[in-house]
Amino acid sequence: MSEILKSPIQSPLLRGFVTSRRCDASEIEDLGSNVTKGLRVAGGRRVLRSHFFSYCLTYPAVNVAATTETGSGDGATEKCVYLCGNSLGLQPKRTQTRVNQYLSTWGTQGVQGHFKPLEESPLPTWLDADDRAAQLIAPIVGASKAEVAVMQTLTANLHLLMSAFYKPDINGKHKIILESKAFPSDHFAVETQLRHHNLDPATSMITLTSPSSPEDNILTTAEILSAITTHAATTALILLPGIQYYTGQLLDIPTITAHARTHSVFLIWDLAHAVGNAPLHLHDWGVDAAAWCSYKYLNGGPGCIGGLFVHERNSAVPPPVGELEVQQKEGEWEREGYANRLAGWWGNDKRTRFAMVNRFRPVPGAAGFQLSNPSILDITSLTASLEVFAEAGGVGALRGKSLRLTAFLEELLVGEGSSIVGVEERALFRVITPSDPGQRGAQLSLMLRGGLLEAVMRELEKRAVIVDERKPDVIRVAPAPLYNSFEDCVRFVVAFGEALAVARKEVAV
């Protein structure tokens, strides 16, 4: 952590602030401003908050600072702190512009919008909209454009990938490995895939629990590799998260991927919490396949369209379905690298897509896994945010600031020199996210003592602080580098300490 917390943070202002629990709004603002300026000099990225709408900029909350310092308690509005990008990202301001441009195309062009762009509009035709989005998402996941497709939603894409690449043999490889505390939708997807193949999850599903961390289930790389080795002979597929949704742990994707390939086990990564958060190099790492959503760090909007990655070695294009009679050589149809998949017309070659011929020739690459024409409204919303990422220099450029933000937040919460959160309140929570910056993204997960969650969340909301809760006892705090600042981190920690103090008295722990 010392390498991340450079000297600009170790300022007299910070040292004076964190050793005193009494502060006012101007002190908080000064601290956040000075730290931010210092980090810019040290090579940090500029806050891009101006590109985003601020959630509840004047949230109607109790003015706690006024109540504490002056006793006025006049109910004045408080600037809202939004540290919830791991659940739903903020809306980029250009989203409204792009959506209005899409509506203008629809309103004035009708069906011709599929093929004819509106004059002076930057939007592509609807036929090419998904292609443009793929071009923008490819560098974010570290892939070629041909290896990514913008389509469907996360769980649907996981099912589509499993339908193509999970080929169980009850007498050989038939098991699926996943973590014991996987996001429920991933768990449901695996269970139903097994049942779809008339397999019993009790005997064909392996769930990983960390022997060294059974409560939090922080799986070490060694534990995962050992499980793969142990079950390789009977395992057909592995599903793992790039970043674990509950703990915020970033797994060692390249090492685990390489080990699975050594044992000829197909591995799918759920990148819901990794995409737009941590640098990814899916092609270079040799990842088999992956899927993600776009409403968290990618800021596409609630329920927005998802995406998937299929490595080029797994997406070869075969002869057209319906012309098998011309293939005389045995096995020529199953060309190396081709995976049969659930198909639809939008995955068909663009040159013949509208010819209405019942011969399926998939688009080369991941786009050949598409089914129906995608929602252009969704793609327009997503593309607006991806443009902001491109202007910011991509995830790699943002990672430096993200590391500093998260380390700063951790230091304020539990650092030896910080007493913003009182001694009694510190005993009421612990950080379950790995302290190693290389094993986490932007999220810190705080495990509260039992029974405190409801009261703490209520008190945070009163103080105009928005974070995410995961029952029974976890608060997830995610400073997103695109729009969050060091001041946001300070304001959260002050409010969190106060919320814990109220909850402690209320629950009597």
Curated annotation (Swiss-Prot):
Pathway(s) it belongs to: Amino-acid degradation; L-kynurenine degradation; L-alanine and anthranilate from L-kynurenine: step 1/1; Cofactor biosynthesis; NAD(+) biosynthesis; quinolinate from L-kynurenine: step 2/3
UniProt keywords, alphabetically: Cytoplasm, Hydrolase, Pyridine nucleotide biosynthesis, Pyridoxal phosphate
Enzyme's top EC category: hydrolase
Listed EC numbers: 3.7.1.3
UniProt xrefs under Pfam families: Aminotran_5 (PF00266), KYNU_C (PF22580)
Reactions catalysed, as given in the entry: L-kynurenine + H2O = anthranilate + L-alanine + H(+); 3-hydroxy-L-kynurenine + H2O = 3-hydroxyanthranilate + L-alanine + H(+)
Gene3D superfamilies in UniProt: Aspartate Aminotransferase, domain 1, Type I PLP-dependent aspartate aminotransferase-like (Major domain)
Function: Catalyzes the cleavage of L-kynurenine (L-Kyn) and L-3-hydroxykynurenine (L-3OHKyn) into anthranilic acid (AA) and 3-hydroxyanthranilic acid (3-OHAA), respectively.
Protein name as catalogued: Kynureninase 1
Lineage: Eukaryota, Fungi, Dikarya, Ascomycota, Pezizomycotina
